[in-house]
Amino acid sequence: DHQLYRSDTKMSLLSGAPFDDPSWWLLHNDQIVAARDMVNDFAGSQRMLGHTVITPGQDGWMDEVDRAIEVLKPDSWKSYTIGDPLSPSKYPWRLDDEELMYPFYEKAVKAARNGGPKATICIHKGLLPPDYETSFKGVWQYATVDDVPKAAQDWPEMNFVIYHSALRPFLELPDQAWNEFEESGGYIKWASDLAAIPEKYGVTNVYGEIGSTFANSAVAHPRFCAIH
């Protein structure tokens, strides 16, 4: 009520996050869509959008894609290439994995052409602790953006929205990232790589989202926030 009807907020997007242990899921896909539909019905207009969270590589994940297209009718898709955002996952994956992901893109594009969910996939990238090379050993590479260019080139009808703009710091002051920025002459780990993709690879379907990273730095380090 306060967020949508007593504030200047005009639109919101309800999302979720997957975990290797399903009991940890923040919201399940049916809950996301039910909440979206309730808010929009109450408002009498579209005030909330909703994701379907997909889990590439896990059993039955493409069945959930089919169910979402036919039943849930989300506004777009959400996933985590690192698999599990809080601990090393058994199910990391890459956007440019032709065998795993390209059949999904094909379904997503076809559904969008037929009036279904937008051909937009929102991907969690970045947001790892300072010791990520050890605490996420073997999987941290999946939180970087080196898998974005080929997927974007091969699927121009898909929109790739990279959440957090792949900024590395998570639940910490961005001082370390700022120092790296100054010492490198203007490079922000992974976020700069993302920003370079459209011009470097000639694509127009890659976007950076800044919600959490803005919140993490706007007050604590406004100079870094402005540059990022």
Regions flagged by a language model, labelled:
Residues 10-11, 46-48, 160, 204-206:
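Generic preference for hydrophobic/aromatic residues in regular secondary structure cores
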Residues 11, 16-143:
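Active-site gating/metal-coordination segments in enzymes
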Residues 1, 6-7:
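Extended N-terminal export/anchoring regions of large proteins
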Residues 8, 72-73, 156, 202:
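Short loop/turn motifs at secondary-structure junctions
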Residues 4, 13-14, 34, 38, ...:
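Surface-exposed intrinsically disordered loops and tails
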